[in-house]
């Protein structure tokens, strides 16, 4: 089995595991400021990707990332599906076009695409409040452990933010004091990816 096959299959399993373990928590966060189904939706998307992992692992890495993104768009639903899907599809396309050496450039372009898709920016209590800090860490080529830590810290910081996008924005000031569920799921996935990559590199 090629290294990228192992990588794709391993990352899919790691992401599925962490979302399954925290799905109820994510839905609990979402009940406070949204529809209450974020954990259920994320788990459905991750299970769909996991079910098709053998097909994805046979693809070149960039293509696999793009195809996984498409699967998430079709299966997660709600606002999160298009955002996570856009992120991965853009990363995959940019890696395919520019080569896999510069992941930071691909990530930067993909995060901007997510911002455009969601019509959001940093500080508005969305998953972008994790994606932008993670992007900063990747650009600076910080260690994987530092990237994971920054993601977790950034998700926590959304507790003090007022929601300006999505259903949570209808709550106005009452959205303050609650962690954004999209930011939390993004931090969880970032942490799972970083920990897997760290272990994979050491193997």
Give residue spans per PLM region:
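N-terminal loops that bind phosphate or other acidic moieties
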Residues: 1-203
């Amino acid at each position: 089995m090629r290294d990228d096959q192992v990588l794709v299959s391993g990352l899919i399993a790691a992401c599925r595991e962490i979302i399954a373990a925290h799905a109820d928590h994510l839905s609990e966060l979402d009940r406070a400021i949204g529809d209450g189904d974020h954990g259920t939706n994320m788990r459905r998307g991750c299970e769909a990707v996991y079910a098709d992992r053998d097909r994805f692992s046979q693809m070149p890495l960039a293509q696999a990332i793009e195809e996984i993104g498409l699967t998430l768009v079709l299966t997660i639903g709600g606002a999160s599906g298009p955002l996570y899907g856009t992120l991965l599809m853009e990363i995959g396309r940019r890696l395919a076009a520019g080569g896999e050496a510069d992941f930071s450039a691909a990530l930067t372009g993909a995060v901007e695409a997510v911002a455009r898709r969601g019509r959001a920016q940093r500080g508005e209590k969305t998953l972008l409040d994790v994606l932008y800090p993670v992007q900063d860490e990747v650009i600076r080529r910080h260690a994987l452990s530092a990237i994971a830590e920054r993601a977790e810290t950034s998700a926590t910081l959304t507790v003090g933010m007022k929601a300006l996008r999505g259903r949570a924005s209808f709550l106005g000031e009452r959205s303050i004091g609650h962690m954004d569920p999209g930011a939390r799921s993004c931090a969880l996935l970032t942490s799972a990816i970083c920990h897997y990559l760290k272990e994979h590199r050491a193997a």
